Structure formats: structure tokens, C-alpha cells
Amino acid sequence: MLTTNILCLIIPILLAVAFLTLVERKILGYMQFRKGPNIVGPYGLLQPAADATKLFTKEPLHPLTSSKFMFTIAPTLALTLALTLWIPLPMPYPLIDLNLGILFILAVSSLAVYSILWSGWASNSKYALIGALRAVAQTISYEVTLAIILLSLVLTNGSFTLSTLTTTQEHMWLVLPTWPLTMMWFTSTLAETNRAPFDLSEGESELVSGFNVEYAAGPFALFFMAEYANIILMNSLTTALFFGAFHNPSLPELHTINFITKTLILTTMFLWIRASYPRFRYDQLMHLLWKNFLPLTLAMCMWHVSTSISFASIPPQT
């Protein structure tokens, strides 16, 4: 039974990842006054299948000087961690209802840094190594603000369980009382997933393709899938944290439709931002976090602690 449940979780995620690549190419195409993929299948709908067939039938190449074991294990680890992150997410029922679901997501997303670091180091290429070091520094830095924002929300929510966030937001979305945190969270998720305008690790003009420059065929596809699975996950998490979905115990289907719609809107915003903004400079990226976001999130965290105490109001308990 558990195997069936796991497959029912993994297969839709992989399908969503496949079609997200098509949606991205379509959106970028229309924003640049062209059609995007429209040859393979009706309206280009079979393009993801064609891409997958091409990538997984090509021969995976290993550079002669690379560390074979780590070179192979890094993309596998990246996708495994990206799929593991979905376990505690309520849609409307999680695969495993963890008491510390928020901490679980934070801990597992921190481990994703290792797959990037290993891939850059094992490739034995200076471009890949510089890209990996940039990505690791960026990911670790932005996790600091993500953790503090999550702490503020936990203080508001009164529980580390993600499913109680739905109960907390039955009358009002958390985006309304915590809108500065929402804006910083959304920007930090862009940086955390290495998306434009924070795609410093994949700067084509400087590093060719960043940490995955030596990867081809299947292993490259695994990295690609992990990146897009993380994008959808981060937007699903944003929906759960700030835009609590409509919840009616007698109609759980409406919760799912609502959840998917909000996630889709946020994901489209990710793609829209990619088409609209140029890449940040590396020092600007770090300045934004350490000089702007960190003091602000700490101040907001203290604000959330003090308001609860001063008004003698306790958050909803589980």
C-alpha cells in the first residue's frame, strides 16, 4: 500500500515537471513575440516526451579525469532529495503527517547543497567548480532568511505541522498580516532554487552552464528534473504557508483544485520574472541578503514574538 502511495505522489510530480518545461518555453516564447514549441503533437504538447526520449537514449559521457562514483551519484541524490521534500506537504492529505514537517523540509533542502557541491567537484572542471561554489554559497546564505521567516510563521501558527497552517488560515490568509515576510520569502525562494535573476551558478556568459557543464544525457536530465521539482515544491510551500487553501472536510477535492491553482499562478510568476529581469551581480546578491533581508527578517521575528506576548494571545494549538 505504501509503495502505491509513493508512486501516486512521484508520478504526478514528474508529469508536472515535464509540462512545466513546456509551459516555460511557451511563456518565454510569447513574451519574445514567437510561438515556442508547436511542432511535436498538437500545440507542442508532446514536446516534453520528445525531450525525455532524446535525453535518456543518448550515451551518458564521463570526463576522463572525473571522479566516476560522485559524478554519477550527485544527480541521483539531487532528484531523490527533490522528491523526498514532497512527503509532508498537505494536498490536502500528506503522504506522512510529520509533527515537524516544516523542520523536515528545511533539513532536507539543506542536504541538496551536497549534490551541487559533489557534481561541481567531481567534474574536475574549473567552470563547474566555480559554479558549484557560487550555488552552495547562495543556497546556504538564503536558507538563513528562509529559516527565520519559517520561525516567524511557526510563532503565528503555533505548530511545526504543515496541515495546521490550513486551520490557522481558515478565516484569513497569513499573507495579509505578514506581507513583508511574504515578499522576502518569495525573493528568497527564487535565490534558493537558482532561478533568474539569481541564476549566478549557471551564468552562461561566464561559466558556460555552471556546475552541470560536464553533464550530458540522463544525468543532466536528472539535475534538470530536480531543479523544476524544487521550483514547484517551493511554490506549493508558499501556497501552504501564506495562501491557505480553501478547506472543507466534506469536499477535499476543492482543496486540491485551489492548491494547484495558486501553485500554478506562483510558478508562472517565476517564469515571468525570468523573462523580465536581467541577472544580478554576485556582490549585489549577497548584499541583498546579509545587509537587507537578514536584519529585516530578524526584526519581523522579534515583532511576531512580542505581539503575541503583549496582547496575551496564544496561537492555535494542535
Swiss-Prot record:
UniProt record similarity statement: Belongs to the complex I subunit 1 family.
Descriptive protein name: NADH-ubiquinone oxidoreductase chain 1
Main location group: mitochondrion
Keywords: Electron transport, Membrane, Mitochondrion, Mitochondrion inner membrane, NAD, Respiratory chain, Translocase, Transmembrane, Transmembrane helix, Transport, Ubiquinone
EC number, UniProt record: 7.1.1.2
UniProt gene name: MT-ND1
GO cellular component, one term: mitochondrial inner membrane
Native source species: Choloepus didactylus
GO molecular function annotation: NADH dehydrogenase (ubiquinone) activity
